[in-house]
Amino acid sequence: MSLLYHKQNQELSSGVRLIQDVNASNSPMKYTAVKVLEFSADSSYEETLEAFEAGIVVLEGKVTITADDQTFEDVGQRTSIFDKIPTDSVYVSTGLAFGIRAKQAAKILIAYAPTNQTFPVRLIRGNIHQVEHRGKYNNKRLVQNILPDNLPFADKLLLVEVYTDSANWSSYPPHRHDHDDLPAESLLEEIYYHEMRPKQGFVFQRVYTDDLSLDETMAVQNQDVVVVPKGYHPVGVPDGYDSYYLNVMAGPTRVWHFHNAPEHAWIIDRQ
């Protein structure tokens, strides 16, 4: 089974298009799933969560989100993903229904993780994101943490946005988090939702294990998804194009501890 999922662009309902729907039924992922929707003006979507929690991330535009008798209006902070403004999200717990209504065009990512635990519905405004500039040389990226492991707002879900400029690498040097060996390393699946600027661009992503029993290198296009059930997973961005991806992570324990590939760890220590 390939780890690369191309854009679907399927009409789901009036004014709502399904761009991605990656889950346990069509992928090797057990702990993570993702859905990406594009809304025309005056369109809506509803869903009921059963044995899953969800993080609803407003990638572009503004929407109204309802869940558990709560209504959040004007959720969203940017007209384009590449505005690089931290956006708004809503966390919804298992057993609840939610609705999304768009007065204008919008793009939404819904991240899922299986759980039987309940947490309060929560609006996560972009202005509380932990923003980091990581790396040096040609290994620089902008990181916007939506739902990191130090915010106790979810049972399993971790969410983060990463911007990588032209001719840089990210998720690099290669690291993995597929061993349940805390505190050294946590077992977390990971899903990448990719976009590029300009849209005709592509990035390269390699997913591989130490023994190379898994070793897949992909040319990833705009709005593609890459799933990482295990292994290292670096991303390279060609000259002339900028990269965005949103990471969905989940596993047995909601902690992100990773292991760098030892043969490439020297890259971190360069002066």
From Swiss-Prot:
HAMAP family: IolB
One Pfam family per UniProt: KduI
This enzyme's EC code(s): 5.3.1.30
EC top class named in words: isomerase
Protein name per UniProt: 5-deoxy-glucuronate isomerase
Catalytic activity: 5-deoxy-D-glucuronate = 5-dehydro-2-deoxy-D-gluconate
Gene source species: Lacticaseibacillus casei
Similarity-based family: Belongs to the isomerase IolB family.
Gene designation: iolB
Keyword Isomerase part of the UniProt annotation: yes
Source taxonomy: Bacteria, Bacillati, Bacillota, Bacilli, Lactobacillales
InterPro entries: Deoxy-glucuronate_isom_IolB, IolB_Bacilli, KduI/IolB_isomerase, RmlC-like_jellyroll, RmlC_Cupin_sf
Keywords from the named record: Isomerase
Keyword Chloroplast assigned: no
Pathway: Polyol metabolism; myo-inositol degradation into acetyl-CoA; acetyl-CoA from myo-inositol: step 4/7
PANTHER family: 5-DEOXY-GLUCURONATE ISOMERASE
Its biological purpose: Involved in the isomerization of 5-deoxy-glucuronate (5DG) to 5-dehydro-2-deoxy-D-gluconate (DKG or 2-deoxy-5-keto-D-gluconate).
GO annotation terms (biological process): inositol catabolic process
Molecular function GO terms recorded: 5-deoxy-D-glucuronate isomerase activity; glucuronate isomerase activity
